[in-house]
Amino acid sequence: CSYSASRKNLYISKNTKVICQGFTGKQGTFHSQQALDYGTNLVGGISPGKGGKTHLGLPVFNSVKEAKEQTGASATVIYVPPPFAAAAINEAIDAEMPLVVCITEGIPQQDMVRVKHRLVRQDKTRLVGPNCPGVINPGECKIGIMPGHIHKKGRIGIVSRSGTLTYEAVHQTSQVGLGQSLCIGIGGDPFNGTNFIDCLDVFLKDPHTEGIILIGEIGGNAEEDAAAFLKENNSGPNAKPVVSFIAGLTAPPGRRMGHAGAIIAGGKGGAKEKIAALQNAGVVVSMSPAQLGSTIYKEFEKRKLL
């Protein structure tokens, strides 16, 4: 069984039934209400010890297994504090939940190494995050903490390690009239459940996605891997336009820049190398996060896709 078989679970829609772990907590309550207001098909939540009650007019369950059996949910979003978040992810894997979106920042790295070890040895569950804004199919389903109102149904697939820079790309693609087909925040931690390649594979196969924005940052080699994947799978006359921005061009080596994974270590993970790798794969790299929308618009113009 191959973990990559679960990539298809990233494609959420208005038919996706969602539950929330950490449902009755402060974050869970706030963001669940936002999701309901957006129109997400949220069908219940989990709060151990509070099973049988209702919250926000929805049923509360003691376990993910119980919630999945009772509601038929195919996705769960996790707003559980860092010390208990890995256990929450594991519980969702046990229940074979097709999509798990973990928002929590600050999960101990050792916990995530163990989760990841388990994750890649199964094919039922796809994890997005941790330390990410989530996944949204505009106008249909919002799983996570992204502001719904800036999104607009459209043609661009967006994948990013940064939350706020995702919102920048979203707002700009909405403003130039291209909109978004699917936006995935893969998170800023070094050990996460979904990488650039997973998302690029979904975008390249999706007929609704006509262009791609990839937002990376210093640290690790995910961008270099993504560049190699694009070179292999997105070249020739039918290639989809890809625009990218890499944060941290001026970052000093050895200093962690906001995200746990955003660090230049052992002389590797700098922005220059990442930019060069992407350009070599035919990606148009924008030097400013403020020009992502205009850059992809120009690429669409060039290819007469407008």
Swiss-Prot record:
The role this protein plays is: Succinyl-CoA synthetase functions in the citric acid cycle (TCA), coupling the hydrolysis of succinyl-CoA to the synthesis of either ATP or GTP and thus represents the only step of substrate-level phosphorylation in the TCA. The alpha subunit of the enzyme binds the substrates coenzyme A and phosphate, while succinate binding and specificity for either ATP or GTP is provided by different beta subunits.
Q: GO CC annotation: what is one?
A: succinate-CoA ligase complex (ADP-forming)
Q: Which UniProt keywords apply?
A: Ligase, Mitochondrion, Nucleotide-binding, Tricarboxylic acid cycle
The record's listing under Gene3D superfamilies reads: NAD(P)-binding Rossmann-like Domain, Succinyl-CoA synthetase domains
Give any single GO term for biological process: tricarboxylic acid cycle
Q: Which PANTHER family match?
A: SUCCINATE--COA LIGASE [ADP_GDP-FORMING] SUBUNIT ALPHA, MITOCHONDRIAL, SUCCINYL-COA LIGASE SUBUNIT ALPHA
Residue stretches in coiled coil? none
Which species does this protein come from?
Columba livia
Against InterPro entries, the record matches this protein to: Cit_synth/succinyl-CoA_lig_AS, Citrt_syn/SCS-alpha_CS, CoA-bd, CoA_lig_alpha, NAD(P)-bd_dom_sf, SUCC_ACL_C, Succinyl-CoA_synth-like
Annotated EC: 6.2.1.4, 6.2.1.5
Q: How does it assemble?
A: Heterodimer of an alpha and a beta subunit. Different beta subunits determine nucleotide specificity. Together with the ATP-specific beta subunit SUCLA2, forms an ADP-forming succinyl-CoA synthetase (A-SCS). Together with the GTP-specific beta subunit SUCLG2 forms a GDP-forming succinyl-CoA synthetase (G-SCS).
Any idea where this protein resides?
Answer: Mitochondrion
The pathway noted for it is: Carbohydrate metabolism; tricarboxylic acid cycle; succinate from succinyl-CoA (ligase route): step 1/1
Q: Which family does it belong to?
A: Belongs to the succinate/malate CoA ligase alpha subunit family.
Q: Which reaction does it catalyse?
A: succinate + ATP + CoA = succinyl-CoA + ADP + phosphate; GTP + succinate + CoA = succinyl-CoA + GDP + phosphate
Pfam families, alphabetically?
A: CoA_binding, Ligase_CoA
Gene name? SUCLG1
Name of the protein: Succinate--CoA ligase [ADP/GDP-forming] subunit alpha, mitochondrial
